[in-house]
Amino acid sequence: VETISFSFSEFEPGNDNLTLQGAALITQSGVLQLTKINQNGMPAWDSTGRTLYTKPVHMWDSTTGTVASFETRFSFSIEQPYTRPLPADGLVFFMGPTKSKPAQGYGYLGVFNNSKQDNSYQTLAVEFDTFSNPWDPPQVPHIGIDVNSIRSIKTQPFQLDNGQVANVVIKYDAPSKILHVVLVYPSSGAIYTIAEIVDVKQVLPDWVDVGLSGATGAQRDAAETHDVYSWSFQASLPE
């Protein structure tokens, strides 16, 4: 069995195992800020940032056809200090081609460039979306499972607990092809789940990068924070 795992219980500035892109930075207090915070402490609009684990993950074996199961956990908070215009845009866990650069921000969350279904993206993502774009369901916020498109194949509304820490678990079971997502707010006790069948061998390249991305909106003050406090990932590919 080929395994890879990493675990950050907090983040250290200058960590060699993480590649920061766009606005993303790690604070002295150990928080990964995916989008920009202005000097006045308020979130900036028109900001996109991502972090990637520096080593690629072997998701499936092109010789034997075996597929990896994986589990990732992270905790984050989204704080929305403004009520007008509507806060935007969200945070996303994604897996896709190695050495990719940030895509469009705003509602595309730094992972996609348009709203088309395009298999060349070779990307699987789980979004925590706070703004309803034309391709989104009307309910916001929502969890979405994205396969080669920002148009989610399945969504689940959730109630944002403003500024509070959310814990996420995303599991993929290769034999059943089930991707299962759980979002928990310890502060309120709220639990949200969503699951869908995804054939990762048909979606992803055999080697992928895994990352987190966040984006704020295209209008002045259409902004919120996207802060990540911990992140772990493990994958195992059978022989």
Swiss-Prot record:
It comes from the Eukaryota. Coiled coil: none annotated. It holds the Pfam family Lectin_legB. GO terms for molecular function: carbohydrate binding. InterPro entries: ConA-like_dom_sf (IPR013320), L-lectin (IPR016363), Lectin_LegA_CS (IPR000985), Lectin_legB_Mn/Ca_BS (IPR019825), Legume_lectin_dom (IPR001220), Leguminous_Lectin (IPR050258). Gene3D superfamilies: 2.60.120.200. Glycans are attached at N17, N113. Transmembrane segments: none annotated. Keywords: Glycoprotein, Lectin. Galactose and N-acetyllactosamine specific lectin. Binds one manganese ion and one calcium ion. PANTHER family: CONCANAVALIN A-LIKE LECTIN FAMILY PROTEIN, LECTIN. Homodimer. Belongs to the leguminous lectin family. This is Lectin.
